[in-house]
Amino acid sequence: MTKDRRAALVRITGRVQGVCFRDWTREEAEKLGLDGWVRNESDGSVTALIAGPDGAVSRMLENFWKGPPGASIADVASEVASSVEAPAGFRITR
């Protein structure tokens, strides 16, 4: 991973299921040119792996706090991840 590229594993909690959060995440990630995936978790949260240029990852982390209409974000927790784990393009995994 070059120094201007990074990856983050993100857990978003609140009202984030049943509000098209995964579709919204994919659309936002594609606009920013990010690679990765997003999925619903059984505890009602959403997990995403985002990878790309540092500035785009930072913008996506900010965007997660807004979410799509109908979402109510309680927390956005992120940790450093390896961009090697991110597939090319962006997909919804479940």
From Swiss-Prot:
The lineage of its organism: Bacteria, Pseudomonadati, Pseudomonadota, Alphaproteobacteria, Hyphomicrobiales. Belongs to the acylphosphatase family. The keyword Heme does not apply. This is Acylphosphatase. The keyword Secreted does not apply. Gene3D superfamilies: 3.30.70.100. PANTHER family: ACYLPHOSPHATASE. NCBIfam families: PRK14425.1. SUPFAM superfamilies: Acylphosphatase/BLUF domain-like (SSF54975). It is an enzyme of class 3 (hydrolase). Keywords: Hydrolase, Plasmid. Pfam families: Acylphosphatase. The active site is at 22, 40. GO terms for molecular function: acylphosphatase activity. Its EC number is 3.6.1.7. Residues 7-94 form the Acylphosphatase-like domain. It catalyses: an acyl phosphate + H2O = a carboxylate + phosphate + H(+).
